[in-house]
């Protein structure tokens, strides 16, 4: 007998198959059967409701919000069960303590996030590297599956400081960026994200650091 049966819902399974009425049996946190008259220790009446796989939102900017809204309510309230953050190169790690201000101002300009909220809502003193950021997120937990890219803009600011807004990286700086990204990937980043969009302007209205990079350095 399963732990839970979701009873009588309309199944939309995402395969393109016609919707149908059925029960869903869940055991040990996994779906083990879909059919009729299934038995379970507990039942959830889904009559009149759709039962479907959780949606995956591949483009979010929850990098900071995850700390003050671990339920990620704009997504979880709409059937999303997996989110991807760090898009467009705007992760909030890696980050040096002295770089918090410029990174927060960058996000304020490009993503319309409140500087004050970013300043007090993120535990900046708990992380510097990208793996440390993921550990800080994990300590608090999230309601959804949470994956995050390591960002190009964040990486350039981490290695180059303010000059990331002004020029391309030197060969030595590129080597340091490669090491930072490799560390992030080994520590749980799901990939590397960048942006060359002309709409992405950051601190003081300047093009974000990833736009200043050459295409060669974008493939670090």
Write out the residue ranges for each language-model feature.
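Divalent metal-coordination and catalytic microenvironments
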Residues: 9, 24, 29, 48, ...
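Divalent-metal coordination cores built from histidine and acidic residues
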Residues: 68-191
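A generic secondary-structure micro-motif detector
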Residues: 60-62, 123, 170, 211
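Functional cores that coordinate and move charged inorganic groups
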Residues: 166-171, 178-185, 189-220
């Amino acid at each position: 007998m399963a732990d839970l049966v979701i009873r009588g819902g309309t199944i939309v399974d995402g395969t393109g198959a016609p919707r149908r009425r059925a029960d869903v049996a869940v055991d040990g946190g996994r779906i083990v059967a879909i059919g009729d008259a299934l038995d379970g220790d507990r039942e959830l009446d889904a009559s009149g409701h759709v039962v479907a796989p959780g949606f995956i939102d591949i483009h979010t900017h929850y990098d900071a919000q995850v700390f003050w809204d671990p339920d990620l309510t704009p997504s979880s309230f709409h059937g999303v069960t997996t989110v991807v953050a760090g898009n467009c190169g705007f992760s909030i790690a890696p980050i040096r303590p002295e770089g918090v201000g410029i990174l927060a101002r960058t996000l304020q300009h490009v993503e319309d996030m409140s500087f004050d909220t970013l300043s007090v809502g993120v535990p900046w003193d708990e992380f510097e590297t990208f793996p440390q950021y993921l550990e800080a997120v994990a300590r608090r937990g999230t309601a959804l599956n949470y994956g995050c890219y390591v960002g190009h803009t964040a990486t350039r600011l981490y290695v180059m400081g303010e000059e990331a807004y002004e020029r391309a990286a030197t060969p030595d700086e590129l080597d340091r960026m490669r090491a930072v990204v490799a560390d992030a990937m080994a520590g749980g980043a799901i990939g590397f994200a960048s942006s060359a969009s002309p709409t992405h302007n950051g601190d003081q209205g300047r093009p974000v650091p990833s736009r200043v990079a050459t295409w060669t350095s974008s493939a670090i």
